[in-house]
């Protein structure tokens, strides 16, 4: 279901899209006044190199225009990458906007506003590419990016339809889901399509604040010691299991061809010495991510009091919505369970209505999160 007038809207220029963006803000209930003098603009960073870095076209000049791309299959795959990235950005704002009036401190409220403004700008950047480079089909996709809704459950990726109901949700989301974003943007920063590579290089610089917000937020929660560690663990189980899905299916053919065509590289493309294992690109990126998250969790565990259970990342097979483990009844520690045992296990290890009720009680005060260290 679209908002009033949406069906009549037509995107002919980027200015038309900007008008539609303003309507989107209004429709989701996001007051632009909250953003102050934030300037929505397109930003282009530096290319790693002017030459295509990998794949069948390695060594050729990066493509500056769609007409330079050799065939329609490559153009379609490129547009699809941009659409999916843009969809995550607008979805994040829709998921998080309800927390503005629940911020524990003014510092946190301003941090959330900054995160939201940068997510909007990243979506803006992707739509700039769609409208200005991809003709009528790109304009249609840019329009659709503002018509899907996280709270209707029709965003393109499952993580971006999940509810973000409280600030523990938010801090865990920005720690782990935004960290996936770092990986996706890094892989796209090597793209053979120069305008995309330049766009995501600029976006990456802003993404680091989102991850910083998540990690320091979780640090402050553990320092305060008011929210039980087992409840924090449940939110890790919720968001990490869905973040694993964001890397795509195992043995992905689309990732294979994106690499062959130079559209999306490896996370460590700039330092990789060995030829790419093109059938395992998603798996290898996910492995890097899991290793990084493990180190972050180790840092957080230093704040867990003696006698309390240590935090951990759920097993890769738990609660998966895509890939070879989808629909299988694995526990958070990787054991295969019976149907009855699994149903009980899920109730024990993912956030429940009772957990949210307890969190709401705890977070009515201001002492559930330690004071932010502002330099």
Language-model regions, residue ranges each:
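Alpha-helical scaffold segments that form or flank carboxylate-/histidine-based iron centers
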Residues: 3-6, 76-85, 104-122, 170, ...
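Terminal targeting/low-complexity segments that flank the catalytic cores of oxidoreductases
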Residues: 1-110, 132-164, 247-375
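Glycine-rich cofactor-pocket loops
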Residues: 193-194, 222-228
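Hydrophobic packing residues in well-ordered alpha-helices of helical domains and bundles
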Residues: 82, 112, 171, 200, ...
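Alpha-helical scaffold segments in carbohydrate-active enzymes
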Residues: 111-132, 202-220, 238-245
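Amphipathic, well-ordered alpha-helical segments in soluble domains
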Residues: 88-96, 122, 177-184, 210-214
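Active-site-proximal alpha-helical scaffolds that flank and shape metal-associated catalytic sites
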Residues: 135-212, 231-263
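Secondary-structure edge/capping motif, primarily at the C-terminal ends of alpha-helices
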Residues: 99-103, 188-189, 221
């Amino acid at each position: 279901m679209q908002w009033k007038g949406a069906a009549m809207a037509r995107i002919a220029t980027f200015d038309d899209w900007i008008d539609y963006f303003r309507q989107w803000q209004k429709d989701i209930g996001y007051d632009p006044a909250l953003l102050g003098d934030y300037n929505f603009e397109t930003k282009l960073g530096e290319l790693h190199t002017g030459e295509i870095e990998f794949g069948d076209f390695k060594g050729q000049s990066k493509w500056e225009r769609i007409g330079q791309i050799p065939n329609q299959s490559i153009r379609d795959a490129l547009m699809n990458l941009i659409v999916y990235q843009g969809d995550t950005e607008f979805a994040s704002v829709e998921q998080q906007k309800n927390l503005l009036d629940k911020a524990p401190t003014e510092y946190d409220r301003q941090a959330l506003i900054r995160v939201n403004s940068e997510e909007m700008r990243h979506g803006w950047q992707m739509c700039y590419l769609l409208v200005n480079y991809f003709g009528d089909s790109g304009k249609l996709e840019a329009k659709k990016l503002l018509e899907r809704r996280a709270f209707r459950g029709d965003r393109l990726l499952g993580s971006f339809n999940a509810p973000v109901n409280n600030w523990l949700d938010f801090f865990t989301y920005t720690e782990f889901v935004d960290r996936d974003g770092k990986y996706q943007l890094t892989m796209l920063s090597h793209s053979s399509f120069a305008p995309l590579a330049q766009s995501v290089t600029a976006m990456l610089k802003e993404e680091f604040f989102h991850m910083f917000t998540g990690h320091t937020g979780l640090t402050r929660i553990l320092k305060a010691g008011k929210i039980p560690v087992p409840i924090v663990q449940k939110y890790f189980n919720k968001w990490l299991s869905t973040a694993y899905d964001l890397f795509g299916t195992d043995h992905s053919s689309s990732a294979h061809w994106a690499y062959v065509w130079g559209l999306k590289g490896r996370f460590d493309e700039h330092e990789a010495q060995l030829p790419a294992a093109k059938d395992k690109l998603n798996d290898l990126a996910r492995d890097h991510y899991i290793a990084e998250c493990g180190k972050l969790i180790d840092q957080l565990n230093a704040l867990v009091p003696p006698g309390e259970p240590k935090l951990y990342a759920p097993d890769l097979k738990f609660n998966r919505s895509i890939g070879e483990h989808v629909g299988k009844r694995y526990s958070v520690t990787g054991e295969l369970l019976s149907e009855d045992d699994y149903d009980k296990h899920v109730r024990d290890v993912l956030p429940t209505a009772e957990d949210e009720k307890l969190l709401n009680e705890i977070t009515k005060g201001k002492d559930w999160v330690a004071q932010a260290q502002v330099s």
